[in-house]
A protein has these predicted regions:
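Cysteine endopeptidase catalytic domains of the caspase/legumain-like
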Residues: 1-193
Length: 193
């Protein structure tokens, strides 16, 4: 008079990770004669899953594939027994570390709002035919703005009061560090990057 049940647990040795295309009761999808999971896996390994430093880890690969599949019925399975993610591949970082190290030069504190104006936008110049706004492009500000835009591309900086950095500059708004950017600001400040 007891309950029968099957224990479908898996036990992984330390350092082992398993990543599969789908659950046992699902079918792996194909797109144009190729497995969708395999296509996403290859894309992840080519750099799509790289972190800001160009490191590709199994966790990053899973996150990339999971995000890419979205709400589709196929769900990848990821099981791991690791205490840290070791890079399995390194690619060229989207933004060089030298740019990330500029965080503390651009922002005195992690919470600082960076004031922008049209002088930060290099196309706001009398040499380019279109409407220009004072203050005109300033070489020093343009250099800083390009750094800020690179940092925005990896999620470290965001415009305040505008959707795009261009309009934040042209409309004299501000930008700020994101929560992730604040974390890396502290790492740079502590000379850990």
């Amino acid at each position: 008079i007891g309950k029968d049940y099957v224990d479908n647990t898996s036990h992984l040795a330390h350092g082992v990770s398993i990543l599969t295309a789908c659950r046992e009761n699902e079918t792996a999808m194909e797109l144009g004669g190729h497995g969708l999971f395999t296509e996403l896996l290859v894309s992840a390994l080519q750099g799509g899953a790289a972190d800001f430093g160009g490191n590709i880890t199994i966790g990053g690969i899973y996150a990339y594939i999971d995000r890419s599949l979205g709400a589709w019925s196929q769900r990848p399975i990821f099981k791991t027994n690791v205490s840290e993610f070791i890079p399995i591949k390194k690619v060229q970082p989207k933004v060089p570390l030298e740019v990330i190290r500029e965080l503390t030069a651009l922002f005195a504190t992690p919470q600082q709002l960076f004031d922008l104006d049209p002088s930060y936008e290099d196309t706001n110049s009398l040499q380019i035919k279109h409407s220009v706004i004072e203050p005109y492009a300033n070489k020093e500000n343009v250099t800083k703005f390009k750094l800020l835009q690179k940092l925005q591309s990896i999620g470290f900086v965001e415009p305040v009061g505008e959707e795009f950095m261009y309009f934040a500059a042209m409309n004299s708004k501000q930008c700020r560090l994101t929560t992730l950017g604040q974390h890396y600001w502290r790492l740079v400040h502590e000379d850990r990057i």
